[in-house]
A protein has these predicted regions:
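Conserved alpha-helical scaffold segments that buttress catalytic/binding sites
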Residues: 2-171
């Protein structure tokens, strides 16, 4: 099976700019030793991110648009028998990559290594940043609004492992 690396340059899911730059730099550095196929997807730089502290759905439309494009690209490459590796900016891109894999494979699991468990919902998020909802969305926990483009399987919660999480919300 061939490998394809997707650079998913987006920081729309967080309030601090810069996470979108990492995938581009990594893709540039990979050219010295990786000869396989790669695709770089970047967020639209004309987007003005929400800085409204009371906005509990920051950049939801823009993230949906970016993730829908990433999702479609991954599904297309999986059909061509590629194994996708997605290098993201913020963790909201994991929603698209996980749903694409769930659609392509019968049963998947996820190992989430992060101090942020990303298991908030639109009701429990304190920041409104969608990266805080990523793991909840892919395991089907109260975030169905984030699967606009995906009809199908989710990651079963019993197949999700958290490593390094500092704490979980009581909700």
């Amino acid at each position: 099976m061939r490998t394809i690396i997707f650079g998913a340059g987006s920081d729309l899911g967080v309030n601090i700019d810069g996470a979108s730059l990492g995938p581009q730099q990594l893709m540039n550095d990979l050219t010295t030793f990786y000869q396989g196929e790669s695709i770089m997807l970047n967020q639209d730089n004309s987007i003005i991110k929400s800085r409204n502290l009371s906005d509990r759905r920051k950049n939801e439309y823009e993230i949906e648009k970016f993730n829908s494009n990433l999702y479609k690209n991954i599904i297309e490459k999986v059909k061509e028998e590629y194994f996708p590796i997605v290098v993201g900016g913020d963790s909201s891109v994991s929603i698209a990559s996980t749903f694409a894999e769930a659609k392509a494979n019968i049963d998947i699991g996820i190992i989430w290594i992060d101090s942020n468990p990303a298991y908030d919902t639109f009701e429990t998020t304190q920041t409104g940043n969608i990266h805080d909802l990523s793991l909840a969305a892919v395991t089907g926990y109260k975030c169905n609004d984030l699967k606009y483009y995906h009809e199908g399987k989710i990651v079963q919660p019993s197949h999700a492992v958290l490593i390094g999480a500092r704490s979980m919300s009581e909700q």
